[in-house]
Amino acid sequence: MFIQTEATPNPATLKFLPGKTVLAEGTFEARDAEAARRSPLAEKLFGIDGVSGVFFGSDFVTVTKAEGEWQHLKPAILGAIMEHFMTGAPVMADGAPASVVEEGDEEFYAEGDEAIVVTIKDLLDTRVRPAVAMDGGDITFRGFRDGVVFLNMQGSCQGCPSSVATLKHGIENLLRHFVPEVQEVRPI
């Protein structure tokens, strides 16, 4: 098994491509060992000293480090991913769905804004999320209120130094161009 590794715009995060489907649908993010319990692979990765976050997409795993050098962490991470896929173990425990809306994470917007929200989500799904996934992350819609779009940033986007620029200059400009009601974009 050959696992490709790619740098991301976030220097604390690397993207690993195992050449196999990681999640058939949705995404999964764990920012601590407690959240990692939903996935045997995430638990393995959190068992490596220095790992502070994991994110799974359709065909990739991104790992965020709290400390340490990639030259020391990378071999252990590659070994854990390879061992996991070689054993055929499931990525998610007990067939648990990857994307779960946590309590308090429900989408919010005014009743009369449904058409605007549909357009915003369509733009995010077709123009933003594929590009962000290439960098090992994901951005999901959370809400729209008083001209402000609220987005959740995951994976390599979380804590990335360039994420504010991407959010403000890229995503905000795109949404404002196609949806005049949008005045601002903010991370949640």
Predicted regions and their residues:
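Domain-level signature for proteins that mediate thiol-based redox and metal-cofactor handling
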Residues: 1-188
